[in-house]
């Protein structure tokens, strides 16, 4: 079963991008490569239970088990030692990636308080888009009663686009609500 967003990409976005940027091959048209969700849990240094809860929430949001990330080097100012678990991340590809992007655009982002669109300045110059979410409560899988602490997460949408303009057109075609 093909995802609704993937069908939209193939039937509407690819022809529109081909026409706008004059691609000679269908393979040259940019596509979403992967989506990386990262949740940094700074207070996991003092309380390991916080990391477990954050990882469980990330698993609910993404539908797959997160990878626990560890500190690469010690920083005395943060009371951090090398090798201590300080976060969780998930890399989504394929079917799950399209399902998550569809859910993010249609359900989660409209639930953000005072939402006027996502910023257009968050492109990295190579066609990738980074979005910070201040609270995990915007996702429908998270039950408000079970949340002990509001945590934010980073969402990185990696595309095969070469420029930010191509990437912006791709994401706009997929329904990403950019601020005017």
Swiss-Prot record:
GO terms for cellular component: ribonucleoprotein complex; ribosome. One of its GO terms (biological process) is translation. One of its GO terms (molecular function) is rRNA binding. It comes from the Bacteria. Keywords: Ribonucleoprotein, Ribosomal protein, RNA-binding, rRNA-binding, tRNA-binding. Gene3D superfamilies: 3.30.1440.10. Pfam families: Ribosomal_L5 (PF00281), Ribosomal_L5_C (PF00673). Part of the 50S ribosomal subunit; part of the 5S rRNA/L5/L18/L25 subcomplex. Contacts the 5S rRNA and the P site tRNA. Forms a bridge to the 30S subunit in the 70S ribosome. Belongs to the universal ribosomal protein uL5 family. This is one of the proteins that bind and probably mediate the attachment of the 5S RNA into the large ribosomal subunit, where it forms part of the central protuberance. In the 70S ribosome it contacts protein S13 of the 30S subunit (bridge B1b), connecting the 2 subunits; this bridge is implicated in subunit movement. Contacts the P site tRNA; the 5S rRNA and some of its associated proteins might help stabilize positioning of ribosome-bound tRNAs. This is Large ribosomal subunit protein uL5. It comes from Streptococcus mutans serotype c (strain ATCC 700610 / UA159).
């Amino acid at each position: 079963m093909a995802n609704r967003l993937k069908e939209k990409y193939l039937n509407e976005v690819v022809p529109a991008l081909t026409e706008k940027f004059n691609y000679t091959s269908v393979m040259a048209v940019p596509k979403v490569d992967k989506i990386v969700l990262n949740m940094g849990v700074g207070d996991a240094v003092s309380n390991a239970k916080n990391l477990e809860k954050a990882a469980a929430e990330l698993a609910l949001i993404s539908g797959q088990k997160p990878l626990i990330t560890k500190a690469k080097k010690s920083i005395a100012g943060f009371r951090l030692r090398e090798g201590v678990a300080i976060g969780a991340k998930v890399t989504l590809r394929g079917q799950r990636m399209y399902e998550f992007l569809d859910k993010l655009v249609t359900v989660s982002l409209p639930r953000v308080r005072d939402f006027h669109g996502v910023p257009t300045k968050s492109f990295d110059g190579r066609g990738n888009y980074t979005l910070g979410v201040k609270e995990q409560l915007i996702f429908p899988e998270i039950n408000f009663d079970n949340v002990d602490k509001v945590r934010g997460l980073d969402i990185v949408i990696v595309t095969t686009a070469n420029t930010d303009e191509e990437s912006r057109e791709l994401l706009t075609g997929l329904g990403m609500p950019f601020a005017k």
